[in-house]
From Swiss-Prot:
Top-rank lineage group of the source organism: Bacteria
Keyword annotations of the record: Cell membrane, Membrane, Transmembrane, Transmembrane helix
Top-level taxonomy: Bacteria, Bacillati, Bacillota, Bacilli, Bacillales
Name of this chain's protein: Uncharacterized protein Lmo0128
Membrane-crossing residue ranges in chain numbering: 4-21, 26-48
Source species of the chain: Listeria monocytogenes serovar 1/2a (strain ATCC BAA-679 / EGD-e)
Subcellular location, record wording: Cell membrane
GO cellular component, one term: plasma membrane
Membrane topology: Multi-pass membrane protein
Family under the similarity heading: Belongs to the bacteriophage holin family. Cp-1 holin subfamily.
């Protein structure tokens, strides 16, 4: 049984590496942001008495969609020979998106959000090639 588990983990790692490329810091941080956003969404919904399994499923579907888009971006980089340029831009875009959502979840619970975290959204947007100004008003 232990051998089967080890081969399963090895197979998962190989597939993950093929789909997403090197599991570098950007990929790890994206996964952390995705998990943090989902958990903060659950906390905010629970805090407000709005927990719903349907909404939870939609949240998981969106997180899987993010990972699919990152995998597609990596495959495009392989075709173009651009060494993760597209993948990294997509990751930075979703880092900004996830951070916005995390901060909005805390605001929903009545918490104040540090300016330094709001400013990171602009940095992530710049690194993704996106220019988004609408996020400031959502967190005041």
């Amino acid at each position: 049984m232990e051998v089967i588990l080890k081969f399963g983990i090895l197979g998962f790692g190989a597939i993950f590496g093929y789909l997403f490329g090197e599991v570098d810091l950007l990929v790890k941080v994206l996964v952390c942001f995705i998990v943090a956003d989902y958990i903060s969404g659950l906390l905010a919904s629970g805090y407000l008495g709005e927990l719903s399994s349907k909404m939870g499923f939609k949240g998981i579907a969106k997180k899987i969609a993010i990972l699919i888009l990152v995998a597609i971006a990596h495959q495009i980089d392989l075709i173009l020979g651009t060494h993760n340029t597209t993948r990294d831009a997509v990751i930075f875009f979703y880092l900004a998106n996830e951070l916005i959502s995390i901060l909005e979840n805390f605001v929903r619970m009545g918490m104040k959000v540090p300016e330094v975290l709001k400013n990171l959204i602009l940095i992530f947007d710049a690194k993704s090639g996106e220019d988004e100004e609408k996020h400031d008003k959502d967190m005041d």
